[in-house]
């Protein structure tokens, strides 16, 4: 069901800005330099900017849909109140014995009641403060519930199938990556091999994320800020170390850097979509904001900052290691760190595994641990909220607290079980990011925006004062056309990779 923050707490737009940035910037950012090294500097920047802009467009559509969903919920509540009042205020028609005064008084009450009912039910003008209040985002309506309100049962079921595949796939990837990273950094212990240590770290990871998944977004505020600091330090370190390498005269010249390799477009496609994904959690982190003016601006600034961070990292990586032919950065001895430049790796942190300072190399190697652990909690909360809405079996008989615990543990621990069974998640990454991610990021927001505005006009005869500037046929068709092209590219990439 729709609902606001369960404990009534809110936070500022600055805090929301941190949440959004943390959720967008994940391990996908570390895979971007590798995609740039294949696609080229210009093509990479253009494609990254295009995907970021399209992601912003579809994010505004979900905000728009969220405001319309709140408007509909408010109006349905008012209609129920009016129905109850009609039953309570019903008066028996006057008889011949009633006095004229009583009859006039009764008629006046009935007329007054009818006028009040019309005022409540009648849509107000497009620019009134009443409209703005009705469209205010006060209730958390998850994307899945919006699909049910605007797309009907078929759209609702399709969306939830796509969403659950995406979220469970995402969490399974994270659950396997974090303990793998820890095992690679620390190595085995005596008789315990790296493989055995992996399961120990997986158990610790489950113990960490399980309790946090019981909370809501606002309860993870300090964890989010700590992660933001850690992430920024790691980003700055990689950028600074790359610039130092360039300044020492070891970097690549502009002639050695790939510029525009259109045949490698598929190499950057999947990771670019993955790097801007935040749409599934928009209701969760926007609803608790205390002042919700200029939400489009808030999202836009976040996407711009993310693009600047991504672009800077990718450009310096190309000019630092774009001309290096050494395939790996591994050292002959694990006890002595001698910086060995290598080709841009699948994750950019691996370019610094042999850095002279062991502290720096280990810190960067642990970067996915900091990022993914926090993102895991946020996505787990999102999955729990959607499962609570999807599965309503015995909802009236089981307390909300028990349901919350059950679905929180389900959303956080099942992916851990998947990571326990397998550590090979490469195919899962491609399917999750390319197919399910495409549906959540592009297709569903377009459908929600189109049909929510259609319902608003046809049933309520009113336009949304918080309407997205991109809600028109041109952008709807553009997004759907791009989705088809992206689907073809993704399928081709998977076929040539796993044939």
Swiss-Prot record:
Its main location: membrane. Glycans are attached at residues 97, 184, 351, 424. One of its GO terms (cellular component) is membrane. It is a multi-pass membrane protein. Pfam families: Aa_trans (PF01490). The keyword Transmembrane applies. Keywords: Glycoprotein, Membrane, Transmembrane, Transmembrane helix. The keyword Phosphoprotein does not apply. The chain crosses the membrane at residues 16-36, 39-59, 158-178, 197-217, 234-254, 257-277, 303-323, 363-383, 402-422, 428-448, 476-496. InterPro entries: AA_transpt_TM. It is found in: Membrane. Belongs to the TMEM104 family. PANTHER family: TRANSMEMBRANE PROTEIN 104, TRANSMEMBRANE PROTEIN 104-RELATED. This is Transmembrane protein 104 homolog. The lineage of its organism: Eukaryota, Amoebozoa, Evosea, Eumycetozoa, Dictyostelia.
């Amino acid at each position: 069901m729709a609902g606001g923050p369960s404990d009534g707490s809110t936070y500022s737009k600055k805090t929301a800005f941190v949440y959004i940035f943390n959720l967008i910037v994940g391990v996908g950012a570390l895979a971007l330099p590798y995609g740039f090294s294949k696609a080229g500097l210009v093509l990479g920047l253009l494609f990254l900017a295009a995907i970021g802009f399209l992601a912003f467009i579809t994010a505004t559509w979900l905000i728009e849909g969220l405001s319309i969903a709140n408007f509909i919920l408010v109006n349905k509540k008012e209609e129920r109140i009016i129905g109850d009042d009609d039953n309570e205020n019903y008066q028996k028609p006057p008889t011949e014995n009633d006095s004229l005064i009583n009859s006039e008084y009764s008629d006046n009450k009935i007329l007054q009641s009818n006028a009040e009912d019309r005022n409540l039910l009648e849509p107000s003008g497009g620019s009134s403060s009443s409209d703005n209040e009705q469209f205010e985002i006060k209730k958390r309506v998850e994307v899945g519930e919006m699909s049910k309100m605007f797309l009907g049962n078929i759209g609702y079921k399709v969306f939830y199938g796509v969403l659950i595949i995406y979220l469970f796939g995402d969490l399974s990837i994270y659950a396997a990556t974090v303990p793998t990273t820890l095992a690679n950094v620390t190595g085995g212990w005596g008789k315990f091999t790296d493989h055995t240590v992996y399961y120990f770290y997986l158990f610790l990871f489950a113990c960490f994320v399980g309790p946090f998944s019981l909370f809501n977004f606002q309860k993870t505020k300090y964890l989010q800020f700590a992660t933001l600091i850690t992430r920024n330090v790691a980003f700055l370190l990689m950028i600074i170390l790359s610039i130092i390498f360039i300044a020492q005269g070891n970097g690549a010249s502009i002639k050695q850097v790939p510029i525009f390799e259109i045949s490698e477009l598929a190499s950057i496609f999947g990771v670019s979509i993955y790097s801007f994904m935040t749409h599934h959690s928009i209701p969760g982190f926007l609803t608790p904001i205390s002042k919700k003016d200029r939400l489009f601006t808030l999202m836009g600034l976040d996407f711009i900052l993310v693009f600047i961070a991504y672009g800077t990292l990718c450009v310096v990586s190309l000019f630092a290691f774009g001309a290096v032919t050494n395939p790996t950065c591994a050292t002959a001895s694990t006890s002595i760190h001698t910086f060995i430049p290598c080709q841009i790796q699948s994750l950019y942190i691996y370019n610094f595994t042999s850095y002279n300072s062991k502290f720096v190399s280990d810190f960067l190697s642990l970067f996915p641990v900091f990022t993914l652990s926090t993102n895991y909690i946020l996505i787990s909360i999102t999955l729990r909220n959607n499962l609570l809405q999807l599965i309503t079996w015995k909802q009236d008989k089981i307390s909300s607290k028990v349901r919350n615990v059950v679905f929180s543990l389900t959303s956080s621990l099942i992916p851990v079980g998947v990571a326990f069974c397998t550590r090979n998640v490469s195919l899962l990454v491609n399917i999750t990011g390319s197919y399910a991610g495409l549906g959540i990021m592009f297709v569903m927001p377009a459908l929600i925006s189109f049909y929510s505005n259609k319902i608003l006009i046809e049933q309520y005869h009113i336009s949304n004062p918080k309407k997205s500037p991109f809600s028109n046929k041109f952008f709807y068709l553009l997004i759907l056309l791009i989705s088809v092209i992206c689907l073809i590219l993704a399928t081709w990439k998977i076929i040539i990779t796993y044939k």
